[in-house]
Amino acid sequence: MYTPPAFKVQHPALALAFAAARGFGLMVSCDGGRPLASPVPFLIEERAGKSPRVTFHVARPNPLAALAERRGTWLMAVSGADAYVSAAWYTSPDQVPTWLYETVHLSGPVAVVPAEHARAHLDALTARFEQGIADPWTTDKVAPAKLEQLMRAIVVIEMLVEDIEGKFKLNQHKNDADHVAVASQLMAEADPAAQTIAARMVALRPQLMYQNPAGVALAALADSGDM
C-alpha cells in the first residue's frame, strides 16, 4: 500500500488493534491472473513469540475456499471511517479536494483449518460480536443435526500475519489553521463517518481551538476505532 510518511501508522501494534476492533474486512487473493475478494468478519489472535493469526470462514462454494488449499499469501484490507474534504474548507489558497480515511492491510500465508475446529471458530466469532446483546446467540441454540449441516457448508481459513501496514490519512501534513478548518467542518456534517474522522483529527492536535456546532461527542468517537 502506498503510504506517505505523514500518514503511516508507526507502531504495528496500533494498526493490529485497529483491525481487531473493526473485525470486518476484505480478504483478497489471486487465482492466476484473476483477483478474488470476499468481505468477511474475522478474529485476530495475538500469540506470544509468534505471528498474529487471523481466522475467518467462507461458504464452501466460494472460490477462496479451494484457493486456500494452495497456501498462498493473501491480504486482508480493513477500513474504518472515511470522509470527503472539499477544497473550499481550507483557509490556505490553492488547495484541492481530497478524501480522508483509515485503513490497515494485513498479509501472510493462509491455510485451511481442520473441520473439527469449525465450531470453536464459530463460538469465538459469535461471542465477539454478540457482546452487549441482551440475549446473545450461541451455537447451542441450533439443533445438533442442523448445526452439523451448517458447519459442513463453510470452510474456516487462517492467515498468519507476516506484514502489517497502517495508513491513517488525517491531513497530518497540513498547517494548524487548515487542520482546524477541516475538522470543524467535518464535525458539522450529518454523516457519522465524517464526525468520526473529525474526532480523530482533534485527537491528533487536541490543543487547538475547534468549532463544534453540532455538539459532537468527540471523545467517544475518538475512542471507537483505536487510534
Model-derived features: where do they sit?
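A generic local secondary-structure boundary/capping motif
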Residues: L16, D94-Q95, K146-Q149
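C-terminal edge-of-domain segments
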Residues: V113-M227
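Short, basic/aromatic recognition patches
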Residues: Y2-L26
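A generic structural signal for short beta-strands and their flanking turns/coil linkers
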Residues: G23, S38, K50-V54, R70-W74, ...
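Short, intrinsically disordered, mixed-charge
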Residues: A20-A21, E69, M76, D123-Q131
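Residue-level recognition of well-ordered beta-strand positions that form the cores
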Residues: P41, H57, A77, P109, ...
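Short, structured beta-strand-loop surface elements
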Residues: R60-H121
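Short beta-strand segments
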Residues: A21-R60
